[in-house]
């Protein structure tokens, strides 16, 4: 009997060790790929040998940015590249398809990756005005993809990250746009944790829809950055998981620079909102913030 239990224990130990080793190998490969992609984005001429055209078989969109060519050549579902200066090694290719699940566990080369690929929600029309450009990315608690964004939660980490990294830069196929961050939101997706926020709305052309979105962001943001949303803004929302409790998300909401606006950000305007509207469950666990149920009212 004891010998049988020992065999089972050893088999389980070996299996667990193999799984850990496999996860380590895959994560290491993902880290190398992320570093390689960022390096390639910053140095697109790396792929070019004198006298050679590495893209002679590729049909690029007219006016495509030079930095995007290496990535579009690998995958024509590419729609851009995102960077945030001030967050170490934060730079990722962005794709968009009509299927939000396609890149959940696939990298840009369509190979398995636990990190997946960051993608623009299928509902977004990147060529239309008044859009909320909703970008989904994983947070696997290993510092890759959108994991570092959670450090923007000033209720837990203070304002350090925001002061270093107040701007999102999006390299679209034909242009580069800067987005000033206006808020950070902890959002539950289940009503059992408090009233929810429809952050996934992408068409803000209806003033009533826009005003509701703006009201929610202003009530829920954990930081008043001193910058706000106005009707007609192009909005960007970075969306990822977080682990404060089950089924909760962390959002970074930003808006594009307006015509003639000073691109510089005065981070001294930023203030932590200790009374920010938070999911009820978050307040129950961490004893900070205003319960969303009390602020918005619970459904009957």
Label every model-predicted segment.
Residues 1-9:
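N-terminal Sec-pathway targeting helices
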Residues 13-300:
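Solvent-exposed, non-transmembrane regions of membrane-associated and secreted proteins
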